[in-house]
């Protein structure tokens, strides 16, 4: 019995063991299949990310500058222009030293110190800016998602909709076709399919992100090898990396290697086909990339009834079907979250050029770098931030017969590109844009000879001798001495500004810029300030206002004597016509006298005038001398351009500061012994009597946010700024210099 039991158990044990073994085998095979599947998916994903099929490692056989500019093929008397964009190539990527191909291009060509995207730093707006030279507010593509109820009742994703009416400007391919009739080809560039000008590229295949990079190269080379009558004179091409890797914050270095390999293959193909020295190649990008670390959902803070919300690292709110005002809605989130700025189109800084079009929205919400106004499990990096964020900065490299060798162009904003394209295609000056003609002259082999404009501003009509007419009573001043000074001082005929609408009044070291229509409030003051320890540090204490009887025999009628917009503190600076009664939210004049003597670190202001006055005074102490231009401007339609109509109420206040870090040659006009010693800083502030996001910003943050270029000031104040002793190129760089930090 026991033996039978043993036999039975032995059979069961054997059967059980075989079943277990079979399960192990099946499980193992299943696991192997699963792992193989994961590997395959990984390979497919990698191929999808890069869009390439095992590109060979870069060899750089094309490198070297021995034959630079020596095209050996007939039919290339005018070099074709190839513009190649790598989406999301941050300037920071260059520091990783992975994309050696770009370094080699720069050795034989040119590069930019850095390129600032336009605001917001998104793909669609900036790609269209690069080919139109217009800010997004002007060309219509104000974001990757656009809301325009006149065209469509919902928020539209530009990448999904054939909405040609959204593309309002003329891109370079359209201008070239219209003006020359020659051929243009486009490979996936934003707007190639939808612009409404009527002049489309001759060849523009449908967007296909899966098209392998090798095939894209073959396409470009094939186009360049066409017979001269069929060959495009302009090619624009777009590649979606390294942007996708940047968004995922994974395999960025691997993707940069792919980009490097791609450029190497392209350059080798150009070299092998003897095209390298016959083509002007410009490599650009639209923006950088920022790692995300914070998410805020606007819907949980703001009542969204009747509103349209566009999400992103910049959130935009459109008032659509609501009776609430812009200020009411903005007030629901303004100053409620640390580090979040809530602007309306009325108070957003002019330098962002984001108020002209209704498509920008009514309220623009920005957070600190790393903050997004949406939730995503996969998006670990993004862009769209203010170009003051250095992670948004990007690159430009160029090589070809028209470019100098091993030259760096100073930092610039991407609105400048259009004038470069027009010059390289022989069409300079034919299309208006937001760039400045001549900005890129320093990188070109044969730039045009450009001269400064020598227009001079007229002196205002005068009535006789220069004497002081005191406009408010003050004791202890020697009016005769001041009158003698006005009568005998040298007049400044060589002022650094010109305007056909204005004239100047000479006040010795200073000049008053007056609108020829005396009823118009627009005016400015030029001051040459020198610091001395005996200088009265209070702007208004013991000073008095006056006019020069050479230009006026009566004082202006104002309700206050305190609201001067001059920077100096001496009596000579208290020009009565440099008075304007600012709203209390702009200037609390009764505080200035007692506060200017305090140390900056002990004060935190939310008004504009006080921190600006303190900062100007601080700079004067530090540098010893300052050239200051301050004034009032009118721009009611918020397009950044001075209004033509007469106005008695200014909308903006501006100030330009210029100093020398070395020796001065002149203070008015401001001129340093060495141009490289010149420092310039400009501001444009809205004049508003309402709550703004400035109420919850510290003084330095306010000042930095409302910096601008000198050209921005020129446009809104309706004058031209130029220092005659500087070259045309130096004046352009000075006027278009972008400030990303205070002095």
UniProtKB/Swiss-Prot annotation:
Bound cofactor: record note: Binds 2 Zn(2+) ions per subunit.
Cofactor(s) this protein cannot do without: Zn(2+); Ca(2+)
Membrane topology listed for this record: Single-pass type II membrane protein
InterPro entries given in the database record: Alkaline_phosphatase_core_sf, DNA/RNA_non-sp_Endonuclease_sf, Phosphodiest/P_Trfase
Gene Ontology cellular component annotations, sorted alphabetically: membrane
Binding residue positions for Ca(2+): 635, 637, 639, 641, 643
Broad class of the protein's primary localization: membrane
Glycosites: 195, 293, 320, 406, 434, 536, 737
E.C. code: 3.1.-.-
Keywords per UniProt: Calcium, Glycoprotein, Hydrolase, Membrane, Metal-binding, Signal-anchor, Transmembrane, Transmembrane helix, Zinc
Function: Probable phosphodiesterase.
Family: Belongs to the nucleotide pyrophosphatase/phosphodiesterase family.
Name used for this protein in its record: Ectonucleotide pyrophosphatase/phosphodiesterase C27A7.3
Source species of the chain: Caenorhabditis elegans
């Amino acid at each position: 019995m026991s033996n039978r039991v043993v036999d039975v158990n032995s059979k069961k044990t054997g059967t059980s063991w075989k079943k277990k073994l079979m399960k192990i085998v099946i499980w193992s095979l299943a696991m192997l299949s699963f792992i193989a599947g994961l590997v395959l998916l990984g390979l497919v994903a990698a191929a999808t990310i890069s869009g390439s099929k095992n590109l060979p490692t870069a060899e750089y056989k094309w490198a070297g500058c021995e034959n630079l500019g020596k095209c050996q093929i007939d039919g290339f008397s005018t070099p074709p222009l190839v513009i190649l964009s790598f989406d999301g190539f941050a300037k920071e990527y260059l520091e990783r030293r992975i994309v050696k191909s770009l370094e080699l291009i720069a050795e034989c060509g040119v590069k930019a110190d850095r390129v600032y995207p336009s605001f917001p730093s998104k793909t669609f707006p900036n790609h269209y800016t690069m080919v139109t030279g217009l800010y997004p507010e002007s060309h219509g593509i104000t974001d990757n998602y656009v809301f325009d109820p006149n065209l469509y009742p919902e928020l539209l994703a530009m990448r999904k909709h054939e909405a040609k009416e959204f593309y309002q400007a003329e891109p370079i391919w359209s201008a070239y076709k219209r003006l020359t009739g020659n051929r243009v080809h486009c490979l996936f560039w934003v707007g190639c399919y939808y612009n409404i000008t009527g002049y489309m590229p001759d060849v523009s295949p449908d967007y296909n992100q899966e098209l392998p990079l090798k095939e894209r190269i073959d396409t470009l080379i094939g186009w360049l090898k066409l017979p001269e009558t069929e060959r495009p004179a302009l090619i624009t091409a777009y590649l979606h990396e390294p942007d996708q890797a940047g968004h995922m914050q994974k395999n960025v270095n691997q993707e940069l290697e792919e980009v490097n390999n791609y450029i190497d293959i392209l350059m080798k193909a150009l070299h092998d086909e003897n095209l390298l020295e016959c083509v002007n190649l410009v490599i650009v990008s639209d923006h950088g990339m920022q790692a995300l670390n914070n998410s805020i959902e606007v819907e949980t803070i703001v009542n969204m009834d009747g509103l349209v919300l566009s999400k992103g690292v910049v959130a935009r709110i459109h008032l659509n079907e609501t009776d609430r005002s812009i200020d009411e809605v903005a007030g629901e989130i303004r100053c409620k979250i640390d580090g979040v700025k809530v602007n309306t189109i009325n108070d957003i800084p002019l330098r962002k050029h984001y108020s002209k079009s209704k498509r920008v929205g009514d309220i623009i919400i920005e957070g600190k770098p790393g903050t997004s106004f949406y939730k995503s499990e996969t998006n670990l990096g993004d862009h769209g931030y203010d170009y003051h964020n250095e992670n948004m900065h990007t690159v430009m490299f160029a090589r070809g017969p028209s470019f100098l060798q091993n030259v760096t162009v100073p930092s610039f904003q991407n609105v400048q590109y259009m004038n470069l394209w027009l010059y390289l295609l022989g069409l300079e000056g034919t299309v208006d844009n937001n760039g400045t003609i001549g900005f890129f002259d320093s990188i070109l082999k044969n730039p045009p000879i450009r001269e400064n404009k020598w227009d001079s501003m007229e002196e205002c009509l005068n009535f006789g001798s220069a004497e002081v007419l005191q406009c408010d009573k003050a004791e202890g001043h020697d009016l005769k001495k001041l009158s003698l000074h006005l009568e005998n001082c040298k007049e400044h005929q060589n002022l650094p500004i010109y305007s056909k609408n204005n004239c100047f009044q000479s006040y010795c070291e200073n000049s008053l810029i007056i609108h020829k229509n005396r009823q118009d409030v627009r005016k400015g003051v030029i001051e040459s300030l020198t610091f001395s320890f005996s200088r009265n540090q209070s702007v208004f204490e013991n000073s008095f206002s006056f006019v020069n009887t050479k230009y006026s025999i009566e004082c202006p009628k104002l309700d206050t004597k305190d609201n001067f917009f001059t920077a100096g503190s001496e009596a000579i600076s208290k020009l009565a016509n440099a008075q304007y009664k600012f709203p209390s939210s702009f200037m609390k004049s009764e505080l200035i006298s007692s506060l200017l003597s305090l140390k900056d670190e002990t004060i935190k202001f939310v008004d504009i005038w006080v921190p600006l006055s303190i900062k100007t005074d601080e700079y004067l102490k530090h540098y010893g001398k300052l050239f200051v231009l301050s004034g009032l401007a009118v721009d009611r339609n918020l397009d950044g351009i001075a209004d033509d109509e007469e106005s008695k109420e200014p909308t903006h206040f501006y100030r330009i500061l210029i100093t020398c870090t070395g020796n001065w040659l002149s203070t008015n006009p401001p001129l340093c012994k060495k141009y490289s010693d010149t420092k310039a800083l400009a501001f444009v502030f809205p004049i508003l009597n309402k709550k703004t996001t400035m109420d919850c910003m510290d003084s330095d943050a306010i000042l930095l946010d409302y910096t601008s270029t000198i050209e921005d000031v020129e446009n809104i104040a309706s004058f031209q700024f130029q220092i005659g002793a500087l070259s045309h190129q130096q004046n352009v760089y000075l006027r278009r210099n972008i400030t990303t930090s205070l002095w």
